[in-house]
């Protein structure tokens, strides 16, 4: 490492000398792991057992030569011999040959398993944030903060190799300016403890996206602020500040807005109505993050605190058709709700690195409270009201106006005014330690996870139920539902490496103890049992309770109230056996035995029982993998919870009754997965092929008994067989020309699902088995050339069933369009055009075309372009609808939401950065 900056050096030449300076092995070169984080620099040295005392000589370009004596023990299994860090001094004078620098704008390169994107090669408007850059990266998909690269989910977003806001990508995506970014790397991240465990792992490494800042922003501070106002009362304001040094990072951000939208004009985001955010949201959130570490990287502290407020006004009106054998039923549903939620979250992470051990401690806390005020009205009919989603029929239903259609066709209807409140506190503590055993390759892992959760839910409800025979009942309901949950789980693992000729055998015995305690009560009151509380007109205002405790006890609904206390103690023993055929090719098997004790103390009306259970289940996993492929098989077995096995009846919702089932059996699952990777760095080709097959035995489905007279549905869990699914996907990223400016991305997927379930048959009392076979084929492609991008996607769904009354589906959903960026002097334009189409639907209104056009224009001011003014137009042609239609095997649902797809916004952005003074 550098003696001044403590930065690890690479490449480094290493020679092994005898004490009299005779060269034993020379010109060995260090190597980096595939994740390209500089701290992962190693060199493998193989020596005979006759060498006990040697001298290592280190040579790096631009540095003086360094030496380090090492004593090797005689233990035959010893492979690691630690010594102090070797610090190399920079040479005082360095003579360089003449070089010619040619500027290029290659957008992406591949280095082993790492994809490196050059941020400067992607043209973005001056005010762009990181999310707009990420959307333009070939092979990358961004959906509401979730990032997919070549079909794989990105688990964390890093900043200069370190977790940023605990890996929460949305903070960085929304607040980090794109102009600060130098490179974006995507790779499988080795764990922090790999210097203890080595780089050979049996489990799959997490995929991360590492945002590398430009050198001038690695030390100093930056800040930016933005404000905007638009049509329909849309507004936003946000601020972000970041302070960097080599060993510290401080970030602060704040954001208030009511736009409820994360998409940007000129990007590849989805703009069809199915992706519109539902409702109107007033959101306010902010946070602070602190990172501290020492130069030697022996300790690191990362803390993050975030506060959030949300106010959501949600309105919807739905028209539904329920497909039944002897005749469809028709529903009209209207909801109007306002939800308020506050949340405070904190994450803390401490890493401690010692020569022979690694310790990590994580702490997480969360506090949330909120309330929901909602009115829901619904009606189910035998005939179609044929008045769309105007829902005037609901107004007629709950008024004194008489309707011949309602009298003839109504099955049931209800109006439910509800006020709900929730308070929750959660705490979690995790600790893990990796301890190396002397000079051996063996190590011990000790892990602990502890959780505490305390939840209180309360709700008030005025429920008015109408029956098709003209009957009417009013329920004045109140419930409180406190719950306490405690989990504790220590794990001990020993990792043992044994030489087997030229190969290696890894044995990993593991033992895990898990304790779980869950206490949940529901006190359910029918206030309509009391005089003066039993009619909609006379009942006190929603949210009030009787002041007399005896009245509360008189209103207690014992049938739907309960006390539940569950305790679980489980032991999980496993043995992983990995046979290393080569350094990368591994054959592994992991059998496991799970022994569990369950105890349930449950009291409810006529039930007062203590149920206990001891059982043993088996599991297994097989894996055959190499650097470019992986084949896995897994078997799991799970028991139904004791609560599901109780013979109970819950009719707190008079139209949806739920039963237990003492006859439930264990569920078994078989899972097969195949991954194959093809890469060609020279041609910039990346192909990922995946396949999977899943078989479920004794799966638990919800059996449904339907009463066609009253419309009451009774649900009961039952075991069912015949469920399985299979799928395959191919993701391709390929440069089509020599300078890599023309890049093709293709995502092809085929999925087959054999779904066996219980469905209601109109006119019959019992559910019958139904098998629906569905085939879904999807092809999506994009072609990008500098600042222009073409995109298209087509999805075909075929579903069939032998169930009487089932209509075979053959539906196409597809879109095509283009997006681009244009610089006209000081004016920057970003725009996108996309046509969304549907074909093959029985409902003619679903076979439609929508042209969506969005545009953004901006201009920068001041000498350093610190001030930016932008105007955005969303859905300029006004073809996006806030009506969504969904068709599946169970029915057709058409829903209107109070979203605003079309609007314009003026935004003003100011940014400031200060670099340290050059010495």
What residue ranges belong to the model's regions?
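Coil residues (strongly favoring Ser/Thr
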Residues: 3, 20-21, 65, 98, ...
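Short, acidic, small-residue-rich periplasmic hinge/interaction motif at the N-terminus
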Residues: 4, 15-19, 57-61, 80-123, ...
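Short, acidic Ser/Thr/Gly-rich low-complexity loop/linker segments typical of extracellular
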Residues: 21-42
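A short, solvent-exposed loop/turn motif at the edges and junctions
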Residues: 21-23, 44-47, 53-72
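Exposed aromatic-hydrophobic patches
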Residues: 36-48, 83-85
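Periplasmic plug
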Residues: 146-194, 208-213
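Primarily recognizes Gram-negative and organellar outer-membrane beta-barrels
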Residues: 167-170, 190-233, 248-919
């Amino acid at each position: 490492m550098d003696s001044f900056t403590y930065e690890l050096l690479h490449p480094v030449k290493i020679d092994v000398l005898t004490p009299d300076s005779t060269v034993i092995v020379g010109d060995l070169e260090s190597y980096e792991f595939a994740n390209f984080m500089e701290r992962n620099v190693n060199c493998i040295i193989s020596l005979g057992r006759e060498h006990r005392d040697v001298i290592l000589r280190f040579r790096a370009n631009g540095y003086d030569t360094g030496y380090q004596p090492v004593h090797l023990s005689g233990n035959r299994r010893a492979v690691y011999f630690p010594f102090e860090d070797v610090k190399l001094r920079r040479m005082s004078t360095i003579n360089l040959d003449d070089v010619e620098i040619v500027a290029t704008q290659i957008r992406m390169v591949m280095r082993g398993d790492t994809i490196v994107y050059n941020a400067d090669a992607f043209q973005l408007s001056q005010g762009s944030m990181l999310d707009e850059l990420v959307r333009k990266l070939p092979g990358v998909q961004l959906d509401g903060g979730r990032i997919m690269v070549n079909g794989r989910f990105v688990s964390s977003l890093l900043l200069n190799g370190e977790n940023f806001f605990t890996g929460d990508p949305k903070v960085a995506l929304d607040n980090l300016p794109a102009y600060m970014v130098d490179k974006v790397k995507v790779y499988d991240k080795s764990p922090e403890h790999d210097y203890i465990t080595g780089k050979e792992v049996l489990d799959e490494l997490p995929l991360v996206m590492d945002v590398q800042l430009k050198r001038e922003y690695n030390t100093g501070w930056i800040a930016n602020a933005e404000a905007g106002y638009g049509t329909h009362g849309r507004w936003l304001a946000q601020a972000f500040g970041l302070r960097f040094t080599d060993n510290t990072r401080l970030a602060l951000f704040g954001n208030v807005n009511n736009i409820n939208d994360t998409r940007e004009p000129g990007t590849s985001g989805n703009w069809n109505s199915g992706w519109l955010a539902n409702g109107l949201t007033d959101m306010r959130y902010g946070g602070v993050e602190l990172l501290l570490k020492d130069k030697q990287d022996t300790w690191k502290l990362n803390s993050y605190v975030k506060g959030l407020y949300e106010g959501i006004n949600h309105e919807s009106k739905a028209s539904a058709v329920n497909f039944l054998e002897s005749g469809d039923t028709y529903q009209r549903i209207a909801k109007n709700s306002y939800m308020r939620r506050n949340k405070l979250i904190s994450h803390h992470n401490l890493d401690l690195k010692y020569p022979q051990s690694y310790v990590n401690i994580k702490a997480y806390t969360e506090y949330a409270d909120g309330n929901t005020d909602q009115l829901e009205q619904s009606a189910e009919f035998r005939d179609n009201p044929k008045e769309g989603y105007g829902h005037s029929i609901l107004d007629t239903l709950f008024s004194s106006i008489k309707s011949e259609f309602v009298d003839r066709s109504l099955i049931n209807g209800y109006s439910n005014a509800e006020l709900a409140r929730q308070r929750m506190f959660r705490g979690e503590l995790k600790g893990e330690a990796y301890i190396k055993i002397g000079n051996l390759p063996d190590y011990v892992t000790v892990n602990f996870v502890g959780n505490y959760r305390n939840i209180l839910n309360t709700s008030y409800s005025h429920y008015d139920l109408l029956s098709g025979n003209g009957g009417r009942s009013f329920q004045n309901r109140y419930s409180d539902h406190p719950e306490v949950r405690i989990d504790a789980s220590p794990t001990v693992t020993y990792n043992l490496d044994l030489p087997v000729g030229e190969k290696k055998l890894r044995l990993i015995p593991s033992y895990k103890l898990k304790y779980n305690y869950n206490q949940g009560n529901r006190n359910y009151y029918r206030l309509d049992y009391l005089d003066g509380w039993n009619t909609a007109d006379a009942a006190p205002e929603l949210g009030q309770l009787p002041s007399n405790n005896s009245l509360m006890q008189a209103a207690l609904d014992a049938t739907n109230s309960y006390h539940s206390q569950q305790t679980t103690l489980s032991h999980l023993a496993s043995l992983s056996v990995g046979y290393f055929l080569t350094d990368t090719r591994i054959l592994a098997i992991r059998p496991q035995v799970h022994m569990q004790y369950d105890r349930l103390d449950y009291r409810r009306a006529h039930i007062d029982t203590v149920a206990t259970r001891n059982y043993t289940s088996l599991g297994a996993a097989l894996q055959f993998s190499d650097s470019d492929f992986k084949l896995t098989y897994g078997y799991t077995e799970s028991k139904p919870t004791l609560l599901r096995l109780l013979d109970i009846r819950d009719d707190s919702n008079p139209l949806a009754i739920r039963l237990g089932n003492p006859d439930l059996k264990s569920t078994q699952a078989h899972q097969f997965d195949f991954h194959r990777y093809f890469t060609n760095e020279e041609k910039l080709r990346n192909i990922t092929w995946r396949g999977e097959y899943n078989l479920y035995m004794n799966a638990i489905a919800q059996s449904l008994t339907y009463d066609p007279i009253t419309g009451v549905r009774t649900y009961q869990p039952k075991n069912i067989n015949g469920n399985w699914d299979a799928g395959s996907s191919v993701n391709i990223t390929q440069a089509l020309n020599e300078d890599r400016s023309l890049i093709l991305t293709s995502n092809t997927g085929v999925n087959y699902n054999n779904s066996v379930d219980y469905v209601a048959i109109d006119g019959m009392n019992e559910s019958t088995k139904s098998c629906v076979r569905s085939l879904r084929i999807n092809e999506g492609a994009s072609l990008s050339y500098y600042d222009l991008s073409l995109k298209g996607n087509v999805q075909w769904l075929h579903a069939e069933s032998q169930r009487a009354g089932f209509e075979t589906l053959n539906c196409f959903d597809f879109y095509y369009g283009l997006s681009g960026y244009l610089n006209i002097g000081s004016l920057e334009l970003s725009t996108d055009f996309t046509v969304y189409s549907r074909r093959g639907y029985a409902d003619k209104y679903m076979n439609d075309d929508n042209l969506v056009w969005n545009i953004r224009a901006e201009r920068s001011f001041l000498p350093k372009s610190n001030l930016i003014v932008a105007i955005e137009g969303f859905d300029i042609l006004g073809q996006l609808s806030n009506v969504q239609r969904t068709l599946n095997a169970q029915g057709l649902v058409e829903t209107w939401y109070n979203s605003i797809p079309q609007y314009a916004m003026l935004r003003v952005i100011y940014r400031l950065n200060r670099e340290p003074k050059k010495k």
